[in-house]
């Protein structure tokens, strides 16, 4: 194994003695404005409070610094970004395949799955696959897709049609449904 120094990740904010400015605009622990003070005076106030002096806005003139517990600040920041990530939902496209001769029982099962996908907030891609002599009968494909569109978009008001096929593309017809936005 190779030995070496472990590189510390760069901190986004300078703290305490890392601050280079001679004068800083200081904000207290509770967010109150203290005013423009020398760096040494700001460091003394932070030390008295038992916390860190953190450079919040280094590009301001003079730089803005706040007296705060830096460890707690980083923890709160990482916690809030983690919560934001959890709240975001990645929309997936779920696919259900039909055939022109899909029977009513299979249709109902696939319809239930489509309803579940749309209620979960995912898009649904309905692929109607043709084989052999079925290619000549596009209207049979429409007889499968139109009831689906009617059931999901008009009767249940669950989805909006993003794309609806007008003709066979290759050996299949594809309809894409997106969930309706919840108020």
UniProtKB/Swiss-Prot annotation:
The record marks 107, 110 as: Important for 30S binding. Pfam families: IF3_C, IF3_N. It is found in: Cytoplasm. PROSITE patterns: IF3 (PS00938). Monomer. HAMAP family: IF_3 (MF_00080). This is Translation initiation factor IF-3. It comes from Serratia marcescens.
């Amino acid at each position: 194994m190779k030995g070496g120094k472990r590189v510390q990740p760069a901190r986004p904010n300078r703290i305490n003695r890392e601050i280079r400015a001679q004068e800083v605009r200081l904000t207290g622990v509770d967010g109150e404005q203290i005013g423009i003070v020398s760096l040494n005076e700001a460091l003394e106030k932070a030390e008295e409070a038992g916390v860190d002096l953190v450079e919040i806005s280094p590009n301001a003139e003079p730089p803005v610094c706040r007296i705060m517990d830096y460890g707690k600040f980083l923890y709160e920041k990482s916690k809030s970004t983690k919560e934001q990530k959890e709240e975001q939902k990645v929309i997936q496209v779920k696919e259900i395949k039909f055939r022109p001769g899909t029977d009513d029982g299979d249709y109902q099962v696939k319809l239930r799955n489509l309803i579940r996908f749309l209620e979960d907030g995912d898009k649904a891609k309905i692929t109607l696959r043709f084989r052999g002599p079925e290619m000549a009968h596009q209207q049979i494909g429409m007889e499968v897709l139109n009831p689906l569109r009617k059931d999901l978009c008009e009767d249940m008001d669950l989805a909006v049609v993003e794309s609806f096929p007008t003709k066979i593309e290759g050996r299949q017809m594809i309809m894409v449904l997106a969930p309706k936005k919840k108020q």
